[in-house]
From Swiss-Prot:
Keywords: ATP-binding, Coenzyme A biosynthesis, Cytoplasm, Kinase, Nucleotide-binding, Transferase. It comes from the Bacteria. ATP binds at residues 108-115. It catalyses: (R)-pantothenate + ATP = (R)-4'-phosphopantothenate + ADP + H(+). The lineage of its organism: Bacteria, Pseudomonadati, Pseudomonadota, Alphaproteobacteria, Hyphomicrobiales. It comes from Allorhizobium ampelinum (strain ATCC BAA-846 / DSM 112012 / S4) (Agrobacterium vitis (strain S4)). Its EC number is 2.7.1.33. This is Pantothenate kinase. It is found in: Cytoplasm.
Length: 330
């Protein structure tokens, strides 16, 4: 097929989340998508890409050229359109208010590569000719503390929707979209596997905010008491879902867990230090159990169902590189 726009064939590769010609998405192979880069310059070096990627993520300059430069160009057009609409509205209302940040949400399973995508995009976007101020915040800091989760008997549900302080998360995004200065984002330590008490990152009116987390496209049940509660995605100007087959994510998760045993888990201060001292077979069994009893359930019940809410879906293949892109029609 020579055309870049794919309908039925694309839906087959993306698990039939829409049917026939009524799909709200346009589908592209990675090679077709790469052509949309046009003349977008490569502004990252190989060393920078290696620094930005997560453990066991093979992204390289070729993948940046193939996928992320076109994505950067697309996002640039959305940001420019948002700015134009803002200026037109100012003229319409005869006001001179300051534009609020453009927020990009990035969702997907654990071990699928969300953090790498977020960090690479942050650097690419910050190097646009307009030199926008770009900040990155993850939802990890909005998890309840381990002490709270233990108290509520929810530690084994960490990462599930109920383990997040949704009210605090919504207050944060509301403040960002209201254009407030010096908004505090709580910090999280992957070493101690816990939020850091009284530690925050200050977000001061960026031009663009990238908000990354497994549950950022989560929907809510309609309220029964008549109170209207916004969803996290209500604050997004653009959203991205990182996708892959369950079996691939499973393999990546276990492989990453085993590699962390040889690196981060060896730190005596690591919450998972005990896994660095057991046998490889024992560690593999634990990783499999964590996947099947926690992460797979969360993926099926809470994360994957949010995929059709994304504006753009990056579908990865066996080598952890993007094979297909789905872009929502306007």
């Amino acid at each position: 097929m020579t055309t870049a726009i794919r309908q039925a064939e694309g839906e087959e590769a993306l698990d039939h989340f829409q049917v026939g010609s009524y799909s709200p998405y346009l589908f592209f192979s990675s090679e077709e998508w790469a052509r949309f880069r046009a003349d977008t310059p490569l502004t990252l070096t190989l060393d920078e890409v290696h620094r930005l990627r997560s453990i066991d993520d093979p992204i390289d300059l070729a993948e940046v050229r193939r996928i992320y430069l076109a994505l950067s160009r697309l996002l640039s057009s959305h940001v420019e359109s948002s700015q134009l609409l803002f200026e037109q509205r100012n003229r319409f209302l005869s006001t001179n208010v300051t534009k609020t940040p453009f927020i990009i949400g990035i969702a997907g399973s654990v071990a699928v590569g969300k953090s790498t995508t977020a960090r690479v995009l942050k650097e690419l976007l910050a190097r646009w000719p307009s030199s926008p101020k770009v900040d990155l915040v993850t939802t990890d800091g909005f998890l309840y503390s381990n002490a709270t989760l233990v108290r509520d008997n929810k530690l084994n549900r960490k990462g599930f929707p109920e383990s997040y302080d949704t009210a605090a998360l919504l207050r944060f995004l509301s403040a960002i979209k209201a254009g407030q200065q010096n908004v505090k984002a709580p910090r999280y330590s992957h070493l101690t596997y816990d939020v850091l008490p009284d530690q925050h990152t200050i977000i001061d009116r960026p031009d663009i905010l990238i908000f990354e987390g497994i549950n950022v496209l989560q929907s809510r049940d309609l309220p029964r008491d008549g109170k209207i509660v916004p969803m996290v995605s209500d604050f997004f100007d653009f959203s991205i879902y990182i996708d892959a087959e369950e079996s691939l994510i499973h393999n990546w998760y276990v492989k990453r867990f085993m590699k962390l045993r040889q690196t981060a888990f060896r730190d005596p201060n690591s919450y998972f230090h005990r896994y660095a001292t057991i046998s490889e077979d024992e560690a593999s069994t634990i990783a499999e159990n964590l996947w099947s009893h926690i992460n797979l359930i969360n993926l099926r019940d809470n994360i994957q169902p949010t995929r059709p809410r994304a504006d753009l879906i990056l579908r990865k293949g066996e080598n952890h590189l993007v094979e297909q892109v789905a872009l929502r029609k306007l």
